[in-house]
């Protein structure tokens, strides 16, 4: 027998009871004997009990299957988003490294090696968090998306289409498609 054809003990007992009841009903009908009304009533009760047990078994199987599916989804979500709190704590570190690079005096030759070190550290950190599903939301000239952008201001602009991101004040981040922090942006509007 294949694994699909194998039956659980409950299924076997239920099937045997059903077969026995059907054989008794058929034997009674074939012989044409006059059946005691009490026997007929008991056969009806037996048939009803079998039907109830069969339905109960099906409901129990469905419930077990639903629990298994929910558990699989919960485990999958736990694996996928286990890093959410840790990732959120890393975002200020990334911001500080970016601010350090933005404010660094790149014309000072004495700071060149330090600036390169900070750039490499930032790149290494972004590569490391990227391996775990963290993505940067910080593009300009893209349509404003309230799911990943937080509009801080709206500015008139002839250079940008209306409702497009003009400037990113603070980058946002997603973890496996789930928003960790929205990007703070300036949004363009049509000139009046």
UniProtKB/Swiss-Prot annotation:
Where is this chain primarily localised? cytoplasm
Entry's Gene Ontology cellular component terms: cytosol
Q: Which UniProt keywords apply?
A: Chaperone, Cytoplasm, Stress response
* Compartment annotation: Cytoplasm
Compositionally biased region (Polar residues): 20-31
Q: Which GO terms describe its biological process?
A: protein folding
Any single GO molecular-function term of the entry would be: unfolded protein binding
> Which portions of the sequence form the region Disordered?
1-34
Record has Glycoprotein as a keyword: no
Q: Which InterPro entries match?
A: GrpE, GrpE_coiled_coil, GrpE_head
Pfam families associated with the record: GrpE
According to its UniProt entry, what is the function of this protein? Participates actively in the response to hyperosmotic and heat shock by preventing the aggregation of stress-denatured proteins, in association with DnaK and GrpE. It is the nucleotide exchange factor for DnaK and may function as a thermosensor. Unfolded proteins bind initially to DnaJ; upon interaction with the DnaJ-bound protein, DnaK hydrolyzes its bound ATP, resulting in the formation of a stable complex. GrpE releases ADP from DnaK; ATP binding to DnaK triggers the release of the substrate protein, thus completing the reaction cycle.
Similarity section: Belongs to the GrpE family.
Note the subunit structure.
Homodimer.
**What name appears for this protein in its UniProt entry?**
Protein GrpE
Source species, please?
Yersinia pestis (strain Pestoides F)
């Amino acid at each position: 027998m294949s694994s699909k054809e194998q039956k659980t003990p409950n299924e076997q007992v239920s099937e045997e009871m059903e077969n026995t009841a059907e054989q008794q009903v058929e034997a009674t009908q074939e012989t044409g004997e006059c059946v005691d009304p009490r026997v007929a009533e008991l056969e009806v009760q037996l048939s009803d009990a079998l039907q109830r047990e069969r339905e109960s078994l099906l409901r129990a199987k469905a419930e077990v299957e639903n629990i298994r599916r929910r558990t699989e989804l919960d485990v999958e979500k736990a694996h996928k988003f286990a890093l959410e709190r840790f990732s959120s704590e890393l975002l200020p570190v990334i911001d500080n490294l970016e601010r350090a690079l933005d404010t660094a005096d790149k014309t000072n030759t004495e700071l060149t090696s330090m600036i390169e070190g900070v750039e490499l550290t930032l790149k290494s950190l972004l590569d490391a968090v990227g391996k775990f599903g963290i993505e940067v939301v910080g593009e300009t000239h893209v349509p404003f998306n309230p799911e990943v952008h937080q509009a801080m201001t709206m500015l008139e602009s002839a250079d940008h289409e209306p409702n497009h991101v003009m400037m990113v004040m603070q980058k946002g981040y997603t973890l496996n498609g789930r928003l960790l922090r929205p990007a703070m942006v300036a949004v363009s509007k049509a000139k009046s």
